[in-house]
């Protein structure tokens, strides 16, 4: 059984090895298939007390494929390599965030 080095945990998916781009695409495909609006956010720290993350551009209202969202994730990664980056699924009917997961952690962690 493979165990990961002891590190800080942020969410359910953080107990798994880092997600590959293919795995991120599958998660984003789920967001799109449920009719949620994907968005990309970033922040310098990932503390439970940090309620507000900076939005990368606008939410991707017109995104039809997971490739479009993944391209934005990769752009954000290249612009902010020392920040945490997460993908968010927003339900515009309930007006709330339904899910989010971290897709990039700074190299210091």
UniProtKB/Swiss-Prot annotation:
Signal peptide: none
Inducing or repressing factors: Part of the rbcL-rbcS operon, transcribed in light and constitutively during growth on fructose.
UniProt keyword Transmembrane helix present: no
UniProt xrefs under SMART domains: RuBisCO_small
Major localisation: other
Gene Ontology MF: a single term: ribulose-bisphosphate carboxylase activity
Gene Ontology CC annotations of this record: carboxysome
One Pfam match: RuBisCO_small
Cell compartment(s), UniProt: Carboxysome
SUPFAM superfamilies (UniProt xref): RuBisCO, small subunit
Chain coiled-coil ranges: none
Gene Ontology biological process terms in this record: photorespiration; reductive pentose-phosphate cycle
Family: Belongs to the RuBisCO small chain family.
Anything else known: RuBisCO folding and assembly commences when the nascent large subunit folds with the help of chaperonin GroEL-GroES. Both RbcX and Raf1 help folded RbcL release from the chaperonin and dimerize; dimeric Raf1 binds to RbcL(2) leading to an RbcL8-Raf1(8) complex. RbcS displaces Raf1, resulting in holoenzyme formation. The basic functional RuBisCO is composed of a large chain homodimer in a 'head-to-tail' conformation. In form I RuBisCO this homodimer is arranged in a barrel-like tetramer with the small subunits forming a tetrameric 'cap' on each end of the 'barrel'.
Subunit structure as annotated in this protein's UniProt entry: Heterohexadecamer of 8 large and 8 small subunits. Forms complexes of many stoichiometries with Raf1 and RbcL.
Record function comment: RuBisCO catalyzes two reactions: the carboxylation of D-ribulose 1,5-bisphosphate, the primary event in carbon dioxide fixation, as well as the oxidative fragmentation of the pentose substrate in the photorespiration process. Both reactions occur simultaneously and in competition at the same active site. Although the small subunit is not catalytic it is essential for maximal activity.
Protein name (database record): Ribulose bisphosphate carboxylase small subunit
